[in-house]
Structures are given as structure tokens and as C-alpha cells.
Amino acid sequence: MGEALRGLKRTIMCGEPRENNIGEKVTVMGWVQRKRNLGGLIFVDLRDRTGIMQIVFGEEINKEAFEKSDNVKSEYCIAVTGEIVKRQSPNNDMETGAVELKGEDIKILSESETPPIYIKEGLDASENVRLKYRYLDLRRPDMQKIFMIRHKTCKVVRDFLDENGFLEMETPILTKSTPEGARDYLVPSRNYKGMFYALPQSPQIFKQLLMVSGYDKYFQITKCFRDEDLRANRQPEFTQIDMELSFVEEDDVIDLNEKLLAKVFKEVAGIDVKLPIERMPYKIAMEKYGSDKPDLRFGMEINDLTEAVKNSEFKVFKGAIEAGGSVRAIKAENCATMGRKQIDKLQDFVKTYKAKGLAWIAYKEDEIKSPIAKFLTEEEMKAILEKMDAKVGDLILIVADKNNVVFESLGALRLHLAKELDIINKDEFRFVWITEFPLLAYNEEEGRYQAEHHPFTAIMDEDIDLLDTDPGKVRAKAYDIVLNGEELGGGSIRIHDSKLQEKMFSVLGFTKEKAWERFGFLLEAFKFGPPPHGGLAYGLDRMIMFLAGTENIKDVITFPKNQNAFCPLTEAPNVVDENQLEELGIKKIEKED
């Protein structure tokens, strides 16, 4: 049985003692990293979240403590009192390596079985084991550093927003289901049988209602929930830094958030963010990078060859252009010697993005090699090389198809090649604002328009008339902040006119009755003097991934789910008692074989 503290207080953390603490009598508490018995002396490395302290026990220091220390093992939780002294052999690899603690008294607070994972940096264990024993995984120094970074980030954000007049306010977790986009997590109501709450995908509607309420600068750091298929950087529950402001336009929100980003990245990670951050319209991002989340750390931009080959008789080019598509290409420098097998793999790669094929031109020292050369005139080949600014050693990769297929396939190929060729500077942080997004996207299956962001996004002033005549061309007052090809956050100016909001719902295929059934409380609120307003939300988890230098979102969440939205630690979700289901008015239906 472990010993009680009996009034004993920790006076210093394990990672804090330095030479200026020599001579002080202190008490440290933590976990045994390792123990070394050298006969007359026992050395214990004691660890807490701040670091490691070496403790030395000896018969001449205190016989009782020496004998007791021989019983401790790895991961025992202990408390030690003694004097800080200068180490005879300093360890320059440790922050506390100039000093050690002479152990005069020891309490074994609790014992530990042999841990199923090693408590050390750079652990090589399966993800499932790490998640099952997450409380041990979280003891590891590299994990503890991540969560100290997370804490500091939240503090810097809170301090900055407080200094800029924001109020931290909470919005409901149990709310109304308004299915549009990702699936909701539903919570059955005991009091209203057959009815359900939904967990919020974002605080969007409530923060807009707070603007109507007169709280002109709101923020919160809050949980959001989406029941969607998981990817490497997604979790079913995640954390947002959410904000909303009244009486603002796009520039106001963007300028404020540039200052916030600069402060966070500098104070938390020592990274300088060059201001102002570049802004790029969505159309340009798609045409140059094939993505609305462009990675600007390398070139290899997409070039439009449509004009250069507009009169070509080559069926692939001609067919794409006549169908309203385009012919575009990227240039891979020093890749002209790439073998046929490698190029075949690239062709297979673009086909996964619905491209019909991949044409190529290798600009070699003694020849221009290409399977499509025989279909092109000399003038067309020359025009392509000029447009691509091709030099000896370059490989030109061409896709001809519908624009969306061309952009998506070449954008993905650009990233794929950059990783394969190792031309991305991993130490660089390239921010960019993507602006002027399409307001709507047409869903062929449902035969209606859908909001690209959400149905509350304001329309660019010059495009309002297009809502009646050509909704697909309407641009939104929306903006995403992108870092190294990942969306860090996004927001927009909101519609604050009830008639325009109703019209927006109509364009989205909602009847007036359906719109009022789902969003009547918001439309009603908009009758009472709503201010112009807009905001932005960051994915905190993704931000921490950048600040901590990890590529796995599970590393930055204390108790994450696995790729199947299952928690190996608690084994959630789980089967519940029939009595609980009965109280909720729910009956299980057994599937027939």
C-alpha cells in the first residue's frame, strides 16, 4: 500500500533545479524513470512534466532512505526530500544536469506494475496499444511537451482576444438538428420520446444570435462534433477557436486574425509570420495549384496550354477543348530521365482523380521525347515548351479534361511529385488567405445547389443580382486561412437581412415552410435589427499539429478515437442497458440474417 503525504508539500518541480538552487532543501515528487544501484550509492532519475532530476541515495546520506530506495522500480510514484548539491560529473544533455538531489527522505506514494509501453520519447508502439494505455502514453515527455504547447496556445489566444475587447461566452452543446453537410451526432430525449437533440457541428447559429443580442465581440474555445468518415487529420469530436464580430467587413476580420496568428506562432513556437499575409482568390488558387488549400512552399504551378493547342487535331486535346474543358500541365524539373515504369505510376495516380490519362514530354539534351509528339505540329510543340518555360532536363505532364478533373488531378499530382522529389522545405511556414469562394455548388444527384460553406454566408456585393440569373457564378464573402497546404481556419461575413436569408434558402431548394421549420428562430431574430457581422473559426487541433511539429492529430488530443471512431481505452461506444433504452423510448431492432 502506498504511503500518504501526511502534510508533505512539493516545493520544486523535477525540471526546475539549477546551480543557483545549490544548498536548498527541497521536496520533489514524480515518477521513477530509471534506477541504478552502484553498490554504496543508488541513483534514481525522477520525472514529472517539467523534466528529470537525478537523485542520489547513500548510506552516508541517510541509511533508512538508502535502503528504502532500493525497493523502487520504474514508474513508481515517489516523494523525495533532500538538499540540492553540485554534481561531480555534470550531464550536459539534461536541463538539470549541473545538480542533483541528496535523498534524505523518501515516501513511496504508489507502486507500478511493469508498463505495457516504454515511458520515453520517440516511442515505437502500435497506435492501438498507445490509445488503450493512453494515460501511460501521456506520461511520455514528448507528449507532455505537446500539451504544454496546447495550453500556451489557448492562453495566448485568450489574452489576445481579451485585450481586443472580446467576451468569452458559451453556447449550447445540446441543440437542434439542422442536417446540411456532415451527419449530426444525435442524443435521444427522455422527456420528449421520439425526439432528439444534436451535438453541434459548430456554434455558427448561436454566435450569430449573440451578435443580434448586442455582444459585438464573442469568442470561445469549444468542442464540435461531426459524424463523418475519419481521415488522418480528422476526429469525430474536435476543438475550435471560434469568434464573431459585429459591424465588420472582410478586411477587419482578416487584419485582426493576422495579428492573432503572428502572436500565437511567435510566442508559442518562435516562428515569425510575415504580415500582411498573401491573399489569393479561389479561382487563381484552383488554376495555379489545383486546390483551394495550396501549398506555396514549392513551385511546379499549373500552366494553361489551351490557347497553345486550341487548333490541334490531337483528339484528346481537341475533345477536351470542344467539351468546354481545358489542357493544362505542370513541369517537373530535372525529371526528363524518369523511366517508363515511373511515368506509368503517375498515369495510374491521376486516374484515381478521374483523369482519363496523362500525356508527357521529356526535354532531353539530344531530343524531345514524347508519345504524343507524332500528333502535334512543330509549332504546337514549340508553343507548349515556350508556355512551360521548359529547359533541358524538364518533364512536362499534361492533363486534358473537364476543368474540375484537370485541376484536381494536376493539383494532387503536384503534391505527390513534390513529396517524391523531396523539394518541400519542411522548416518553412507559408500562410495564404483564400478568398472569393463560390457561394454555391450544384449537386447533380439531388438536382439542387448546396452551400459551399454554410447557408449564412454573405454574397459579394457585385454578385447579388446573379443569385437570380446564374447562382453558380455567385462569389461569397468567405475566406480561409491556409498553412502549408492545410486549412487552418475559415470564416465569412454573414447575411444579416432576413429577406436575403430567406432567398438564400430558396436557392438552396428549401421551401419557405422548410426553412422556417429548421431555422425559424434565426429568421425571427433577424426581424429585430441584426448588425452586419462576420467571424472565423480555427481548428485548434490542427493548429497545435503545426506548432508541435506532428503530422498525427491523435498526438494533440488527450483521449482521441481511432480511425473507426472507437476508443480503445474506454471501449466507447458501448452497449447500454435495456432499461436505459426503455426510458428513452428506444427499441433495438435485430437484423435478420
Curated annotation (Swiss-Prot):
It is found in: Cytoplasm. Residues 204-207 are annotated as: Aspartate. InterPro entries: Aa-tRNA-synt_II, aa-tRNA-synth_II, aa-tRNA-synth_II/BPL/LPL, Asp-tRNA-ligase_1, Asp-tRNA-ligase_1_N, Asp/Asn-tRNA-synth_IIb, AspRS_core, GAD-like_sf. It is an enzyme of class 6 (ligase). GO terms for biological process: aspartyl-tRNA aminoacylation. Its EC number is 6.1.1.12. GO terms for cellular component: cytoplasm. Signal peptide: none annotated. ATP binds at R226, D227, E228, Q235, E487, G539, L540, D541, R542. One of its GO terms (molecular function) is ATP binding. L-aspartate binds at E180, R226, H453, R494. Catalyzes the attachment of L-aspartate to tRNA(Asp) in a two-step reaction: L-aspartate is first activated by ATP to form Asp-AMP and then transferred to the acceptor end of tRNA(Asp). This is Aspartate--tRNA ligase.
